[in-house]
């Protein structure tokens, strides 16, 4: 049913019906507005989004752009952490009466183009390099909140991040308490930067505090090509054994869970033969067996914090850029062997 047909059935003008749809109720009685709403609901009327934007003079869209490091577009949204983050953002955006426009970008130029062409009230941009964030701020006037972007100390940008250093430091301290002294750090970058570099730094800090020196030989890089990673995990295991490593600390749950699955298929026992840890506490870490020992981050809180920061900018209540760092905690699964007692940890308690 059209607006004209609804108006004729109620004996009101099309302008009156349109005013109810677009929320312009200043010159209308509550009774008339309620009558029109009831008729709209009765016929399941869905207003045209473009018309609503024109009527209000702005959009109701929050743009979400993801460009997490070293992620191919076809892979980025399959990463459980990324998909969980996007789902949490969409839920928070919808709960506040807005709509989500999503794009998985591959290049800085693409991000710049999208930011200029989207009719969005603001942008939440995830996983950019710091130089890309700076460039983006120069080419768009839209309010922007960054998520997991790593700026130099003293730089002032709206960013919601995680205590990545602290999280990996906690994990390394946990492993040290269980008697592990020789550890292999596993990532997917030949030269670590961004979040991966922060996590490695936390690992190094914990080792140094325990009087142990980290060596570059104790870093193993796996391929981003999924077809090659089976061979990589086999080489990783052989390399860890040559170095005498008792545990592999993975940069993310995604790779840790994939490695456990591969190793179990090869008859390698986790944690009896080698211990494995992850980072993120995504859904895969909770369903894999043995359950993964990992670092938890609250993705829902991160999404809500980013959105609230954006709304503070829109409402002009944010006087200056804010950089927020969210805490982490250890999730103790059963993928790590307790070397002190030569037994396996079988607890799901959190530290």
Feature map (PLM): residue ranges:
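Alpha-helical recognition/docking segments in bacterial nutrient-uptake
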Residues: 61-173, 236-243, 254
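N-terminal helix-turn-helix DNA-binding module of bacterial transcription factors
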Residues: 1-60, 343, 348-351
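Periplasmic-binding protein-like
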Residues: 117-126, 184-187, 219, 241-253, ...
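An alpha-beta-alpha
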Residues: 169-210, 322-335
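Hydrophobic alpha-helical segments within soluble ligand-binding/sensing domains
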Residues: 160-185, 201, 228-237, 297-315
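Short beta-strand elements in bilobed, periplasmic/extracellular small-molecule ligand-binding domains
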Residues: 90-104, 200, 204-228
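Flexible loop/turn connectors
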Residues: 233-351
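Short beta-strand segments enriched in small/hydrophobic residues
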Residues: 18, 54-75, 174, 182-189
């Amino acid at each position: 049913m059209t607006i004209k047909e609804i108006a004729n059935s109620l004996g009101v003008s099309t302008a009156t019906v349109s005013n109810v749809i677009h929320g312009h109720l200043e010159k209308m009685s509550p009774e008339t507005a309620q009558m029109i709403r009831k008729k709209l609901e009765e016929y399941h009327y869905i207003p045209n989004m473009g018309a609503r934007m024109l009527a209000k003079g702005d959009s109701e869209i929050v743009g979400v752009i993801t460009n997490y490091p070293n992620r191919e577009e076809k892979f980025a949204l399959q990463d459980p952490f990324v998909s969980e983050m996007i789902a949490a953002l969409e839920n928070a955006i919808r709960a506040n009466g807005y709509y989500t426009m999503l794009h998985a970008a591959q290049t800085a130029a693409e991000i710049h183009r999208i930011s200029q062409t989207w009719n969005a009230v603001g942008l939440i941009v995830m996983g950019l390099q710091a130089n890309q964030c700076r460039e983006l701020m120069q080419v768009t006037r839209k309010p922007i909140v960054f998520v997991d972007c790593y700026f130099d100390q003293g730089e002032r940008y709206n960013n919601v991040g995680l205590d990545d250093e602290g999280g990996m430091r906690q994990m390394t301290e946990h492993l040290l308490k269980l008697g592990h002294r020789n550890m292999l750090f596993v990532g997917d970058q030949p030269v670590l930067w961004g979040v991966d570099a922060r996590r490695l730094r936390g690992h190094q800090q914990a080792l140094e505090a325990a009087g142990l020196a980290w060596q570059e030989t104790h870093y193993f890089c796996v391929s981003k090509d999924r077809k090659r990673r089976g061979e990589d995990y086999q080489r990783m295991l052989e390399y860890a054994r040559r170095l005498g490593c008792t545990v592999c600390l993975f940069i993310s749950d995604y790779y840790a869970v994939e490695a456990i699955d591969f190793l179990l298929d090869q008859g390698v026992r986790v944690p009896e033969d080698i211990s494995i840890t992850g980072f993120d506490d995504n859904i895969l870490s909770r369903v894999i067996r043995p359950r993964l020992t990992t670092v938890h981050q609250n993705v829902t809180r991160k999404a809500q914090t980013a959105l609230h920061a954006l709304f503070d900018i829109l409402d002009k209540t944010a006087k200056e850029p804010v950089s927020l760092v969210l805490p982490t905690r250890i999730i103790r699964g059963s993928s790590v062997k307790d070397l002190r007692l030569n037994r396996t940890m079988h607890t799901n308690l959190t530290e």
